[in-house]
Amino acid sequence: MSLLNFGKPKAMSPTTGLGGFLRGYSIEVMPRTAAKVTDFRALLPEGTRVYIAHIDGTPIEDMVATAKRLNADGFKVMPHFPARIIKDRATLADWIARYQ
């Protein structure tokens, strides 16, 4: 093993380059945006992690419905609720329970 490798450049493999960079990516959607997408399966590989953005003023019911839809389509759903919009522990407990 050498510290400086001045030999031939290594051949690109499926895990390097742009393909490797994009492998395992995640996205974030808002319920109102998700409502405009007919079929996420046509856009994203199965198993993609999809964060559900909690936007102040959007009802929790819309957030949970979006999460259920994406989960049913085979995506790994992750609710993303910022601490600043959670009023108290009871609200946090309620939101977590709704997602379970």
What annotation goes with each model-predicted range?
Residues 2-99:
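Alpha/beta catalytic barrel-like cores
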